[in-house]
Amino acid sequence: MSQPYLISKWMDPLFGIFVGTYGYYLYEKEHRPRGRSLRELALRKWNKQAVSQQSMKN
């Protein structure tokens, strides 16, 4: 018995990726407090690692 698809065999995964990405975008834009977005958290982590690597070199 073949599996049922919402749209088609190839469009279902693309639709899932689109919905997930859009949901993530909305969460980042609306529900995260200022200063806590993924971009800001990643930059903070990156800067922290860069400082620790420079202190190890000196």
UniProtKB/Swiss-Prot annotation:
UniProt entry tagged with the keyword Aminoacyl-tRNA synthetase: no
Matches recorded under PANTHER family: NON-CLASSICAL EXPORT PROTEIN 1
Assigned protein family: Belongs to the NCE101 family.
Biological process annotations from GO: exocytosis; protein secretion
Species this chain originates from: Schizosaccharomyces pombe (strain 972 / ATCC 24843)
One Pfam family named in its UniProt record: NCE101
Function: Involved in a novel pathway of export of proteins that lack a cleavable signal sequence. May be part of the export machinery or may also be a substrate for non-classical export.
Protein name: Non-classical export protein 1
